[in-house]
Amino acid sequence: MKNKVKELRARFGYSQEKLGETVGVTRQTVAAIEKGDYVPSLLLALKICKAFSMKMEDVFWLEEEN
């Protein structure tokens, strides 16, 4: 799964720690999501989208398989 979390976080002026506090996870979890090492639960993805006032499909999308 791909995402724009890092890009949006920078645009909104959030640190990884601040976004983590906002959505209820650690800074390390935010970093892992940004790197694509961790796929968030639906609830967490919705919280992240709400923090940025964006729709799910504008933040997260499936990577096309070859």
UniProtKB/Swiss-Prot annotation:
SUPFAM superfamilies reported in the protein's UniProt record: lambda repressor-like DNA-binding domains
GO molecular function, one term: DNA binding
Keyword Transcription on entry: yes
PROSITE patterns per record: HTH_CROC1
Residue ranges of DNA binding: 16-35
Signal sequence region: none
SS bond list: none
Keywords: DNA-binding, Transcription, Transcription regulation
Protein name: Uncharacterized HTH-type transcriptional regulator YgzD
Organism: Bacillus subtilis (strain 168)
Designated gene of the protein: ygzD
